[in-house]
Amino acid sequence: MAKPSKKNRTHEKRKVRVRKKLFGTQDRPRLSVFRSAKHIYAQVIIDETGQTIAGASTLDKEAKDKGGFESKVEAAKFVGKLVAQRAKEKGVTKVVFDRNGFLYHGRVKAVSTGARDGGLEF
């Protein structure tokens, strides 16, 4: 069987290291971000109960209705605002940001910026 690439191994190490320290509670749920080559996903999770309170991605109807984005970073910022809006509707204002092993740069940073602009407090 093929050995995972060094890039994937280091990503998994970062992910485990970050998740050891983060835990979403009822008061401060976890805002988790996942990015693929084409899309970005964000969801607000309570780890105590395993519930997902709110979620958004570039595949959502609102994002598609908005039309073509200038860049993936702009789309990620829109997803951040969208997940913040949905979380605030459920009564969540404070979250813990989980970058999910991805470097805090580019699209991951844009999601957090959009969520802050949308009214979530980190």
UniProtKB/Swiss-Prot annotation:
Disulfide bonds: none annotated. The keyword rRNA-binding applies. Signal peptide: none annotated. Gene3D superfamilies: 3.30.420.100. One of its GO terms (cellular component) is cytosolic large ribosomal subunit. Keywords: Ribonucleoprotein, Ribosomal protein, RNA-binding, rRNA-binding. InterPro entries: Ribosomal_uL18_bac-type, Ribosomal_uL18_bac/euk. GO terms for biological process: translation. Pfam families: Ribosomal_L18p (PF00861). The keyword RNA-binding applies. One of its GO terms (molecular function) is structural constituent of ribosome. This is one of the proteins that bind and probably mediate the attachment of the 5S RNA into the large ribosomal subunit, where it forms part of the central protuberance. NCBIfam families: L18_bact. HAMAP family: Ribosomal_uL18_B. Part of the 50S ribosomal subunit; part of the 5S rRNA/L5/L18/L25 subcomplex. Contacts the 5S and 23S rRNAs. Belongs to the universal ribosomal protein uL18 family. This is Large ribosomal subunit protein uL18. It comes from Desulfatibacillum aliphaticivorans.
